[in-house]
């Protein structure tokens, strides 16, 4: 259930030394953080866009194209649900379709957070092609994060 998943995303992202208390549907639980902010961002983008896990895991390092509203940033939509960019993803199931979707500022913000995380935590992989990288055995960031690496 998507509500439960979203309620527990902070546990996935929190450092392993942290303890979090999550209340969902009237039930309170305490968890230790799992320390995987990349996986949390993958899940969140997946929930907000409806794209497949593999499509999110294989996003290019710079997958966004901002929508030009013709009058500069101030003339863009103030509605948080308005589309502000196109997200280019890896289409692996269907041939002959445009592999882009319109996304809101919430998705743009998550992608910008991941780009900042990448710069801070994986500067050795700065030239790698993927936004989400395999966490182990991938010093140069040439391999995308696999579904298996965050599903377990």
Give residue ranges: language-model regions.
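Extended accessory and catalytic-adjacent subdomains in large enzymes
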Residues: 1-152
């Amino acid at each position: 259930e998507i509500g439960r998943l979203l309620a527990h995303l902070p546990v996935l992202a929190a450092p392993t030394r942290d303890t979090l208390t999550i209340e969902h549907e009237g039930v309170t639980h305490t968890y230790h953080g799992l320390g995987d902010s990349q996986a949390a961002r993958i899940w969140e983008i997946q929930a907000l866009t409806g794209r497949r896990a593999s499509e999110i895991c294989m996003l290019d390092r710079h997958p966004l194209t901002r929508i030009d509203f013709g009058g500069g940033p101030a003339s863009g939509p103030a509605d948080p649900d308005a589309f502000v960019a196109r997200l280019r993803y890896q289409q692996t199931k269907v041939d002959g379709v445009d592999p882009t979707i319109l996304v809101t500022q919430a998705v743009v913000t998550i992608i910008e957070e991941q780009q900042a995380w990448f710069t801070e935590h994986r500067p050795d992989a700065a030239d790698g092609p993927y936004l989400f990288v395999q966490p182990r055995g991938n010093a140069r960031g040439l391999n995308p994060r696999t579904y298996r690496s965050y599903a377990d």
